[in-house]
Amino acid sequence: MKDRQYRNFIIFWFSQSVSQLGSSMTSFALIIWSYSRTGSAMSVSLMTFCTWLPYIAASIVAGPVIDRYHKKTIMLLADLLAALCSLTVAALAVSGNLAVWHIFIVNGITGFMNAFQFPAETVAVGMLVPKEKYSQASGLNSFTSSLLTVVTPVMAASLSSFAGIKGVIAFDLATFLFAFSVLLFRIKIPENAGGTETGKKKEKEKISVQESWREGLQFLRGHKQLWYLMISMALMNFFSRLTYEN
């Protein structure tokens, strides 16, 4: 049973990694496109701002929502919304009407979606992977993150120079169809982690957003190390963004 769970995770991890590659390539290609049109670093910074502001705002309620609803459904809806955004950009590019402000709006929608997608995916991994294999799963996710950092600029720039922004988005949509199909038809994510009694109880309880917030804050108050870690990471990200823009 546990081996089957882990095999499902491997399939899930691979398909999501492929999809992340497509999404990362599109984001990078749009940065290139925006800068080539405007010659302004400010436009690139605004693209990032339009992504992260909705992400931060939506994160306030994302946790309780993810706790209350099925993780697979949330991921499917988020993926579908991201694909619609890519299709919109592709249609505008084909028609010759794509403008930088369109990308600002699309990035805002994508950032909002990611506030639900990323945590839901993280929780889903915990549900798919047996506890004794958590470190292996974490290693694979770290490998994906590092690999994407290296290969995304090369692949996005190469494909963009050869096929334009439309070619990059076409590749992104192909990776979306692959990951979406795998998640929809192949991956079964349990309603609660490991079928535990605690998980079942929480699924039955219809706790409010305020109660979820209170529970989360109580947990953090009892684990001060998490506060220190969160503050440290926030400061690192803030200062690194002063000199680095992806």
Predicted feature residues:
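Juxtamembrane intracellular "pre-TM" segments in multi-pass secondary transporters
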Residues: 1-9, 189-230
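A single, central transmembrane helix in multi-pass transporters
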Residues: 163-170, 214-246
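C-terminal ends and interior cores of transmembrane alpha-helices
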Residues: 80-97
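Hydrophobic core of transmembrane alpha-helices in multi-pass small-molecule transporters
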Residues: 17, 92, 98-116, 234-235
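Helix-loop junctions on the cytosolic side of multi-pass membrane transporters
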Residues: 96, 123, 127, 169-201
